[in-house]
Amino acid sequence: MEPAEEGEILAHRRFTATKMEYEKIRIIGEGTFGQVILARKGRARYALKKVSKEKEGLSVTTIREVQVLRAMGHPSIVRLIEVVVEPGGDIYMVFPYFPYDLNRFIRSNKMTCSEIKHIFYQIAQGVCYIHSKGIMHRDLKSANILLDQKLNASIADFGMARYTTKTGAYTPGMVTLWYRAPEILLGSSSYTYAVDIWSLGCILTEMYLGHMIFQGSTEMLQLEMVIHACGSINENSYPGVQDLPGFRNFRLPQSPRRIEGIIRKHDASAVELVSKMLCLDPSKRITVEQVVGSKYFEHEARRDASSAGLQGCSYREDRLSLSKRKNVD
């Protein structure tokens, strides 16, 4: 079984699972995570995520995801309905079915500024709630944002999520490469919630451009693309960066900052927010509470959120104590 991260508390006792009562229809997703199957129960449709198992039992990724999802309760976070088991022993996590993910939606539609703000506000609200629980998602990307037919967004895939610790030491190399913050690209294992903010900046930019802005095939190429858009990485733009292992290992190019000009061509109102999210220095990167409170949302998205009772980020006092996290499952 893969090891837990330093300071991470995981309960390895058996999960409560009910008998499989869902009719499988077809596979709708497949990858390193396993399979996602469209299923039916009565007239309702569901998504069944097959749980990965190892010789010693359930993987740490699966245990972590179930624990975290059972602690969640927010309209912008996918709901884990139950865990079911088949007679042969296969285990599935049951979720509501969503017809789209944001990645496919972006590539199939020319999104309006109103749609972008509406969707992104919901994502930011969800991340605000996640962070209020003392959790970093660590895999925010457009493919992990699910959409219903009314463009209501739900954040999914919490296999890489984990609770923050007092030591602040975590596994390096997390987050899908194209959405990975520069501090992780440079080998930091002492990162913060700011890594999720960088990913949010990538998602918002992606919605405007119609494609992901940084598409490196290796960490070095990814860094070069980040530098080309966000400027040179040095002690002026990122104090302390020379202490990171990757800064010594890579010969980084020099470049002026261009990201503001790129976004201004699509929506001038988004320039300031994108600039603050895609800040090279994680200590100066905007917080998710500040994202939610940004003037970027003053007109369309905030009006929509207010009608749904989601005005502002109202979850800051909802962090779990360390003692409660031990029994989060």
From Swiss-Prot:
Role noted for this protein: Catalytic subunit of the CTDK-I complex, which hyperphosphorylates the C-terminal heptapeptide repeat domain (CTD) of the largest RNA polymerase II subunit. Involved in RNA polymerase II transcriptional elongation and pre-mRNA 3'-end processing.
Q: Which Pfam families match?
A: Pkinase
Give the UniProt family note: Belongs to the protein kinase superfamily. CMGC Ser/Thr protein kinase family. CDC2/CDKX subfamily.
UniProt protein name: Probable CTD kinase subunit alpha homolog
- What biological process terms from GO does the record include? mRNA processing
How is the subunit organization of this protein annotated in UniProt?
Component of the CTDK-I complex.
Please name the SMART domains in this protein's record: S_TKc
What InterPro entries does its record include? CDK, Kinase-like_dom_sf, Prot_kinase_dom, Protein_kinase_ATP_BS, Ser/Thr_kinase_AS
Q: Where in the cell is it found?
A: Nucleus, Nucleolus
The taxonomic lineage of its organism, from the top, reads: Eukaryota, Fungi, Fungi incertae sedis, Microsporidia, Unikaryonidae
